């Protein structure tokens, strides 16, 4: 059961997820809306395609730090792994479906990565290893990245997280795979 403090934290996490690094950076540096450029997605990949590697890195880091901040604060305040995973889901939902941008946000991968590192760095390191293996096989980022993300529930089980926490990780994976389906 979620108490009122946790509920407010989830709402705040969702709203914090609404802060889109790509949008802020392009408005500040170029006075344009990234959603009108390239693929129209306000995420790191589109920033890299439109403006170059430096913008990719800045956007990736901004969105990853956003996820890490939310999960780190929740870890300090609440300590419950199931609530931490719920918090990660909330910040990702805020990034993908931001109310401030009429539900048109990024694809959630950078925010997921940052939040996952804050959640459990050992799981993150395990998934980095999985990514490297699949990267060497496929020689690209998209397929290895999505396969790696799909391995999260298995890692949750291997690292002895509760079934509820693991189910929440599955919901996050389904959401990210759905948003990245094209």
Curated annotation (Swiss-Prot):
InterPro entries the UniProt entry points to: G3P_acylTferase_PlsY (IPR003811)
Coiled-coil region: none
Main location as per UniProt: membrane
Membrane topology: Multi-pass membrane protein
Known catalytic reactions: an acyl phosphate + sn-glycerol 3-phosphate = a 1-acyl-sn-glycero-3-phosphate + phosphate
Tree of life domain: Bacteria
Pfam family, one: G3P_acyltransf
Keyword flag Cell membrane: yes
Cellular component terms (Gene Ontology): plasma membrane
EC number annotated for this UniProt entry: 2.3.1.275
Enzyme class at the top of the EC tree: transferase
Keywords: Cell membrane, Lipid biosynthesis, Lipid metabolism, Membrane, Phospholipid biosynthesis, Phospholipid metabolism, Transferase, Transmembrane, Transmembrane helix
Pathway annotation from the record: Lipid metabolism; phospholipid metabolism
Segments passing through the bilayer: 5-25, 54-74, 81-101, 117-137, 157-177
Entry's localization field: Cell membrane
Record family assignment: Belongs to the PlsY family.
Subunit structure: Probably interacts with PlsX.
Listed name of the protein: Glycerol-3-phosphate acyltransferase 1
Organism of provenance: Bacillus thuringiensis subsp. konkukian (strain 97-27)
Gene that encodes the chain: plsY1
């Amino acid at each position: 059961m979620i108490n009122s403090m946790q509920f407010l934290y989830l709402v705040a996490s969702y709203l914090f997820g609404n802060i889109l690094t790509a949008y802020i950076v392009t408005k500040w540096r170029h006075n344009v809306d990234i959603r009108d450029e390239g693929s129209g997605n306000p995420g790191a990949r589109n920033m890299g395609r439109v403006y170059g590697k430096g913008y990719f890195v800045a956007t990736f880091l901004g969105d990853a730090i956003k996820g890490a901040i939310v999960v780190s604060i929740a870890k300090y305040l609440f300590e419950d792994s199931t609530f931490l995973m719920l918090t990660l889901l909330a910040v990702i939902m805020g990034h993908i479906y931001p109310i401030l941008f009429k539900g048109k946000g990024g694809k959630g991968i950078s925010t997921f990565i940052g939040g996952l590192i804050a959640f459990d760095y050992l799981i993150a390191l395990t998934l980095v290893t999985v990514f490297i293996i699949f990267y060497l096989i496929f020689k690209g980022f998209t397929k290895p990245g999505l396969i790696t993300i799909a391995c999260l529930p298995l890692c949750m089980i291997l690292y002895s997280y509760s079934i509820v926490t693991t189910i929440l990780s599955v919901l996050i994976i389904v959401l990210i795979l759905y948003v990245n389906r094209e």
